[in-house]
Amino acid sequence: MDALDKVLKPKTKRAKRFLEKREPKLTENIKNAMLIKGGNANATVTQVLRDMYALKKPYGVLYKKKNITRPFEDQTSLEFFSKKSDCSLFMFGSHNKKRPNNLVIGRMYDYHVLDMIELGIEKFVSLKDIKTSKCPEGTKPMLIFAGDDFDVTEDFRRLKNLLIDFFRGPTVSNVRLAGLEYVLHFTALNGKVYFRSYKLLLKKSGCRTPRIELEEMGPSLDLVMRRTHLASDDLYKLSMKVPKALKPKKRKNISQDTFGTTFGRIHMQKQDLSKLQTRKMKGLKKRPAENGVDDQGKKSKRIKKN
């Protein structure tokens, strides 16, 4: 049995709080990401991992030492580090002659690899190469995806879902306008993914809504997809299962549309409109001339009948 799989009994209150923090919960903790260097990572891959760690702070763990492992051949090392650091997301960087400037991005389910996708770095511009102001640590980004490949191809559809999981940050109920500080833009075109990062500038516009400008902040990457390791449909569905306690209770005759608008259905008996009392207005009263015409019409009808 692995040392991390043993049932541990806390000896101090601090250890008890630490173990309680890792226990299964209805509302899970914020997903942390671990960034790992391979045994032969070069300067480009190392800088990419540093920049990604800067975007993920404080929800990331950067391993500075090199780790000789191959995620697609042996996943035990990744699973060990996942348990040790309590991280469900990972990014692994390596470099060799066959696959230069290589990145593997993936996620865990129950401390086992759920899916991972290998990406090759064709072009890279670092955070420090772009001399502009940066966003503060822990800022929640806005994610934009452009390109039909993200909705057509299964590999790119999974990659989109994985990138959202990796960069979305904590779940919040609302965000103030000044809190929207930077954008991560992903474009899928001709089998490649273009990753860009922009800082959001709110300018005066003369009205209540400010004028928005984008300023490139970095990092910037041109990526090409290589190998994939995707979970089966059953396992993927199991990983997305929502506990019964968190599911909204069904209320009779009440439904919601895709935008969250609540609709209610009311069952009523058929109403007799003949007995409906309407508001009497002066403008609707008959005039004396009209009454005279009506009286003459009634008299003529009586004469004809006689």
Curated annotation (Swiss-Prot):
Domain of life: Eukaryota
GO molecular function: 5S rRNA binding; DNA-binding transcription factor activity, RNA polymerase II-specific
Residue intervals of the Brix domain: 31-234
Subcellular location: Nucleus, Nucleolus
Recorded coiled-coil stretches: none
Keyword set, alphabetical order: Nucleus, Ribosome biogenesis
Sequence segments annotated as region (Disordered): 270-306
Single biological process term from Gene Ontology: ribosomal large subunit biogenesis
Compositional bias segments (type: Basic residues): 277-286
A single GO cellular-component term on record: nucleoplasm
InterPro entries, per the entry: Brix, Rpf2
Similarity comment: family membership: Belongs to the RPF2 family.
Subunit details: Component of a hexameric 5S RNP precursor complex, composed of 5S RNA, RRS1, RPF2/BXDC1, RPL5, RPL11 and HEATR3; this complex acts as a precursor for ribosome assembly.
Physiological role: Involved in ribosomal large subunit assembly. May regulate the localization of the 5S RNP/5S ribonucleoprotein particle to the nucleolus.
Protein name, per record: Ribosome production factor 2 homolog
Species whose genome carries this gene: Mus musculus
